Amino acid sequence: MLYTFGGKAPQVDPTAFISASAELIGDVIVGPRCYIGPYAVIRADASRIVLEEEVAVEDGVIIHTGGEDPVVTISRRVTIGHGAIIHARVIGPE
């Protein structure tokens, strides 16, 4: 499910797969060939979240903003494992 928050709606590349039970909220950008698994929650209510190319967000993952990094970025070809919680961080090369 895609939700607009604060006037910003998720942007999803047409080649990405988003499970019907996943929730993307606010300023989320999902790149090419990404996978968002069942019951994942990606909540960009405080700042932007960017999933670069071929990122896999597995079942039950929570990613949200609100910390030191102004933009949460998950770099190309990173897999976030089942049930992980990512709070306001950059994952992968800088």
Language model feature labels by segment:
Residues 14, 19-20, 25-26, 31-32, ...:
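Left-handed beta-helix
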Residues 49:
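A short, polar/charged loop-to-alpha-helix boundary motif
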